[in-house]
């Protein structure tokens, strides 16, 4: 149920009125963190489309105690977490471990283990059987923060829709719960 809304005027409209432009991600971050202040003891989950799949935005929400679930590109740069730093090591600490295969490669890999799941209320069409695979990783891009995520890869055994990938900033969250949150949004 909507309880907080905000208008996000275009850059041109802000320029015409002599106001500073705030992007959708700026306003979304402010709103989510305001909701966190209003509801400090609650599990707060923000579900958004791929426009909200930005590392700075996701890192700000994660640090603010808000879980985010968004779509993820199939070619996103996912890594293992950084290994522990050995005593006596010089130089800056590593941010990530080894690069993981892309999700598009995992999708076509015959060794990928898929789990069949029934999702109730699939976009208003009733129960839908899908196949998912999931793991935790860190998402990183040069110069941006490292964000620990749980990714979920979804495919339809009946080929009614293209495979899609989701991310959740709570790596411990159950993959089925991540899919259900997206569908119920």
Roles of regions detected by a PLM:
Residues 2-185:
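Single, function-defining residue in the core of a domain
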